[in-house]
Amino acid sequence: MNTDKNLEHLVDRAERIGVVGSPSSTTAVTLDILAPAVNKKLVGELALFRFLQDELMHYALGQIVEVTMRNVWHEDPTMLSLIRQRGRVDPVSERQDTHQGEMTISAVFAAKGRQYRPSILGTVPATGTPIHLVSDEVLSELLSPYQEEIFYLGRVYGSKPLLPLWFKHFGSGPKGAGEAYHLGIFGKTGSGKSVLAKMILLAYARYPEMALLVLDPQGEFAKEARGDSVSGQFKLPMREILNHLQKPVKVYEVKNLILDRWELFAQILYESPFFEHLSIPKGENRQLAAEILAEKLKDKRIPLRDLYLKEKFDIAWHLLGKEDIQKVFYRSGEARARFQSMYEKANVDEFFTKYWLPVTQLFREDRRGAQKIESLLKEIFHLDQERRPLVVVDLSGEGADHALEKIDEVTLFSPEESPQSQPQSAPLFWNETIQLLILKRLLDGIRREAERAYKQNRSLNTLVLIDEAHRLAPREEPDNEEKKALRSILIDAARTTRKYGLGWLFISQTLSSLHREIIEQLRIFFFGFGLGMGTEFRALSELVGGRSKALELYQLFRDPHSSFDTASREYSFMTIGPVSPLSFAGTPLFFNAFNNPEEFRKANPLKSKEGILDQT
């Protein structure tokens, strides 16, 4: 055995900062700080002490959450009078100061040979027991059997050692958790949420048997997955690392998604300006008009994929001119007469190009690189693939603002039609409601695939990341039916999909505005800067419970953007849950996330099934 790697020897060599003081308990240990360590930064440091329990040597680790100083002589009324006169009293001031810290125990290991097993602090060690600072060497020795599973997102808060974390896939086996769990990342804009989420995605991307799906309302993850340059100081080469891991990556934009439901067609047509230019404002009448038109077109066995053709539009236009159809959405003769007047005056070709095509292109199947939502989901959840993919669905709508690529005119027109005066491309219709409808369609499909796999006794082993979760599943009642339906699906998914091997990673700017039922289902939390005041802090306090010292330490986090330059920014996080081998007691841990991509890559020699693929 190499004595340099012997834990006893490593602890002896570690810096001693204090001893166990009084009072102490099995949850919090008082630290009497030694004179040489008084001027060191100790808050946030990871510390360790040895003690004997059940005839086995144990090692207890925890973070120092508070340091206090007391001088009883300075509290004496007579001394206070002297201090007021002189400022200090040499025999008393400074020399009689006593410094104490509070150490919250997060993990305890029992040593048996070179095997270290999780244990508990079942007794309080004697006063005077030495307490040492933890080093990377000590952690490596303690966690040596699990070194391949360890992943690093940053360093211990305000310190140098790397904080070991682990992200296991949701399947069975030696590196699997055996079940899915849900994660949440919370913090203000600029707190480092997105960068942390990308690093976590890369941690899960190491597993070929695990699929990853990112629902991206802002388009940020899509840019990273494509390898495009992104704004910000932390430029993580995500696509390059994924290629090293041999993880298949696919990015789908709005123009790549083929919608495949008649109810979606009716809802999107309702949202579009189509009926508005026929004098039907938003409301019940327009909804009835969209629904009856979709129903009649479906009755005529017109495939959704062909609705963009001019001849199919002509059928739809003809249907709207029929009185029995108009009576469905306008009961009064006066209203029908007004509609008929607008209908007869309308420029049919303009309606086709400006208002019909942008909607119906969403359902067109021969768009270059396009795929049905149903096919996309089957690709993600195909469990027998040797390497399951990371799929990003870009719902930002950036691609929808531009015209589609020029397409073969024979696909737009029937042979007997002359295409000379007709458009050969059209922008896609897009707004926030369409985004919600597509998200709802995706979530419905995910839930069905999960239920199907569960009936076959198979685990999906999939993580779904969803950004802007506070907007999609708010605590307050949404103001329209689409938002209500989407929120309901997300709440149900958080409650039920874990048993299917389907986990969720929710990213939110706020904690108090995300629906309580989703928060209650989360197992792992990451809290960045920005939740230290008002309703956010109250919501955070409810989750952390009675750990007031941990909350006080969280409130010390500084705004990353208050730094003098980008290189010195600190992205601090508090984490709760079974995400670290140093926190099986559920105690909060604090760390500073990497602010340099090279540091991240150096700390994590990313591995896949075949071994180490990236050591740079």
Go through each PLM region and give its residues.
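Conserved P-loop NTPase motor cores
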Residues: 426-551
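Conserved helicase/translocase P-loop NTPase motor core
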Residues: 360-462, 472-483
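Conserved nucleotide-binding/hydrolysis micro-motifs of P-loop NTPases
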Residues: 109, 218-222, 397-400, 470-471, ...
